[in-house]
Amino acid sequence: KEYGAKEIKRPDNIAHDESTSEEALIHAINEIERDNGKIDLVVFLQGTSPLRSSEDIDKAIALFINNQLDSLFSACDLKDLMVWKNIEDNLTSINYDYENRKRRQDMQKQYGENGSIYIFKPKVIKQNMNRLGGKIGIYIMNEWKIHEIDTKEDIGICEYFMNKKELVKNK
């Protein structure tokens, strides 16, 4: 509150374990626009993906504006990971053809959403019930910024990186 932040309480129908971020975002957008008029963009920073700097946020916003995007997400280079899924004990490769396996160096670049920064126009989420849509852009972050907090162990990993000032500075 000291810096102008305002709490927006979710109504009970979107304040349970199965509620989506999109529901909460649409509610918040509607509340803000009701009180302050139309807004141009939303910058959504997930608390469970804390490895970002103010410079990351500024650069992502500039990329969004300069490229006239409708939505943008932050991501990290997956460094040629070969990903599989297991459905009912049936393994299937997701991002490459294992029967025609290429060298990792010859694979196309792939990125993983890191959940750290999302920027979008309010109309995108209102029309699609999704924070991504229209002309989508990507803001690439350092690989170590892919960590999320989902477990107690993740807290320690993120704290490690957050305390490494030589890594965080200008990255």
Task: Give the positions of each predicted feature.
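Conserved N-terminal catalytic core of the sugar/cofactor nucleotidyltransferase
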Residues: 1-38
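Alpha-helical architecture
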Residues: 46, 119, 148-152
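Secondary-structure boundary motif
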Residues: 30-35, 66, 127, 131, ...
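Hydrophobic helical membrane-anchoring modules
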Residues: 138-140, 145-171
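A structural alpha-helix within SAM-dependent methyltransferase catalytic domains
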Residues: 26-29, 33, 61, 65, ...
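Conserved core of the sugar-phosphate nucleotidyltransferase
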Residues: 2, 18-23, 41, 47-136, ...
